[in-house]
Design a protein with these regions (language model features):
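Small-residue-rich transmembrane alpha-helical segments that form helix-helix packing/gating elements
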Residues: 1-34, 39-172
Length: 172
């Protein structure tokens, strides 16, 4: 194997790993702020993707407009779930909260399937499928964008957990 192929695979693998680290960062951020693992986090992410799809394809807005609108929508969905389902369980045994988040996961998946069906749907996110040429290396553009997003989220995570101001904000 020549060095350029090895470098290309190593960089694409590292960028792919950053995508997984975003998922882990979300799990850690929720656990650290609430001391409860949220078993419905994957279903909430899936619902957010379907909301983006509904806004982009249903209303016809561009993807970069649909994403912030879906984020706002999901903020209010999450706040509603917290107020209606999770807040009532504050101070209760952890198993009750885990069971509630598991039930929310099942409910969100079933509701999403009832609305949009069970087949996967293609969605263009506005990133070209053409590889990014970095000298002799070919990089996947979506991985590069993911790496930029991961770096931004790691900076936010660092701010909230390693700076005095972030720790004060978390305490509020």
């Amino acid at each position: 194997m020549d060095f350029s192929l090895f470098s290309e695979l190593a960089i694409n693998g590292a960028l792919s790993g950053l995508m997984y680290s975003l998922v882990a960062l979300g799990i850690v951020l929720i656990y650290k702020s609430s001391s409860v693992p949220n078993l419905a986090q994957g279903a909430m992410t899936m619902l957010g993707a379907y909301v983006v799809l509904a806004i982009a394809n249903g209303i016809g807005l561009p993807m970069w407009t649909a994403i912030p609108l879906a984020m706002g929508t999901m903020f209010f969905v999450g706040m509603g779930i917290e107020r209606v389902a999770l807040r009532r369980l504050a101070g209760r045994p952890i198993i009750m909260i885990l069971m509630m988040t598991l039930g929310l996961d099942i409910f969100i998946r079933a509701t999403t399937m009832a609305i949009w069906g069970s087949s996967s749907r293609p969605m263009s996110i506005g990133i070209s499928d053409e590889p990014l040429f970095l000298g002799p290396l070919l990089l996947n553009r979506s991985y590069v964008v993911g790496a930029v997003v991961a770096a931004a989220l790691f900076a936010i995570f660092f701010f909230f957990f390693r700076t005095r101001r972030g720790i004060v904000l978390r305490a509020i």
